[in-house]
């Protein structure tokens, strides 16, 4: 409806042209299915079937889709193997549900359910890909969800632009100049 915002974050295993082609297929299919007004579970199940049929079974896609209703102050979401977004409310940071297997790994997704969460003005959600969590330093340590949650708590009052810029700088600093093993994406939704 007019009051609902949909956000999707996804990440394809692998690199290069094959991964790019899979992501293009996911993006186009998601846009088509959303325009057909399918629900979150049906959207995810149809994408899973498509990816399972059209890939080599070694490729998979982590996928998180959410419908945000600012009037009801609610978020409904499904998670297929994607790192759970972190919601910050009054300085407390907690993950949304981890969900089920990534898309394409199995012909049918078992245990896929719509979850719900509420938010208040001032809360925000951080959506990200595993390139943030899996950034390693020379000692082999990963940046991880705990460091990310700590960063969110420490910088909760920052504007969205500076928050994201500083997060990437923090992750880069943690890597101590090493090239990242994976790309990274971050998106923020702040509720007013």
Where do the protein language model's features map onto the residues?
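Conserved subregion of the PPM/PP2C metallophosphatase catalytic domain
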Residues: 1-13, 17-24, 28-192
């Amino acid at each position: 409806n007019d009051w609902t915002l949909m956000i999707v974050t996804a990440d394809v295993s692998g690199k290069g042209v094959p991964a790019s082609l899979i992501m293009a297929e996911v993006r186009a299919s998601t846009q088509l299915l959303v325009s057909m007004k399918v629900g979150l579970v049906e959207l995810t199940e149809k994408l899973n079937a498509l990816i399972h049929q059209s890939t080599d079974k070694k490729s998979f896609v982590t996928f998180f889709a959410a419908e945000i209703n600012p009037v009801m102050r609610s978020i409904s979401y499904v998670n297929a193997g994607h790192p759970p977004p972190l919601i910050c409310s009054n300085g407390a940071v907690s993950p949304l549900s981890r969900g089920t297997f990534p898309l394409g790994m199995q012909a049918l997704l078992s245990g896929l359910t719509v979850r719900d969460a509420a938010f208040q003005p001032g809360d925000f959600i951080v959506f990200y890909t595993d390139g943030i969590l899996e950034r390693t330093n020379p000692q082999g340590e990963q940046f991880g969800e705990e460091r990310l949650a700590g960063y969110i708590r420490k910088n909760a009052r920052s504007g969205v632009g500076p928050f994201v810029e500083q997060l990437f700088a923090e992750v880069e600093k943690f890597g101590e100049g090493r090239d990242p093993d994976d790309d990274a994406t971050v998106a923020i939704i702040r509720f007013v």
